[in-house]
From Swiss-Prot:
Official protein name in the record: Large ribosomal subunit protein bL36c
Subcellular location: Plastid
Family designation: Belongs to the bacterial ribosomal protein bL36 family.
UniProt superkingdom: Eukaryota
GO MF term set: structural constituent of ribosome
HAMAP family for this protein: Ribosomal_bL36
Keywords, ordered alphabetically: Plastid, Ribonucleoprotein, Ribosomal protein
GO annotation terms (biological process): translation
Amino acid sequence: MKVYPSIRIMCNKCRIIRRKGIIRVICPNSKHKQRQK
């Protein structure tokens, strides 16, 4: 899981979800997991 000021979609399987105000990217490829500060 990487934390970025702005997240970006790295492939077409990445999904942006919002949980309790935190924006995350979930993807089958674990290298693509991201969270916004």
